[in-house]
Amino acid sequence: MVSIPRDTRTEIVGKGFQDKINHAYAFGGPEMAIDTVENFLDIPIDYYVQVNMESFKDIVDAVGGITVNNDFDFSFEGYTFNKGQLSLDGKEPLAYSRMRKEDPRGDFGRQDRQRQIIQGVIEKGASFTTLTNFSDIMGAIGKNIQTNLTFDEIVGIQKNYKDARHNVEQSMVKGQGTRIDGIYYYSVPEEERTALSSMLKEHLKINDSITKR
């Protein structure tokens, strides 16, 4: 699981200039965002899932809440999160994942908590076997998620890859903050981008002949 910092400076495919990677979606929706991330990581991306984080509580509640491990005590948006293992439901996961300013790691700490939330949903969702549970989840997904996966493909992933949740690796994109013309960017060295791309290709069992389209 890889989180790309939103301020990462890279080429916006289809625009022909460099900008923050999260601007690709604003310029051209999921298609331009996918093209830009594909170019940045040099790997093919066949599917996407766009999540409405403001309504993510519906998905968390549909799986019966989630469990996370919190690194330090903090309060945010009226909620208090103590250090240690926490059970979250309702609007708690969104508040937990959004806090940034009190975290000594800043946006990287927020990215880690966002990955925890996603991992928690995967853990709970993959363990469901009854039709009722699955119907609740699909109902929540239908309201809050946009994807190019078909229903059968979603069912197939839940059925065939649920054990993969026990073997999830998390990677951070290494770089440093910089200012160009007064605007803050996250600059990723070419050697780091190449190393990350190679790692992903190895895990995905793809080679350069596939990525060179």
Regions found by a protein language model. Give the residues of each.
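Non-catalytic, solvent-exposed segments at the cell envelope interface
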Residues: M1-R213
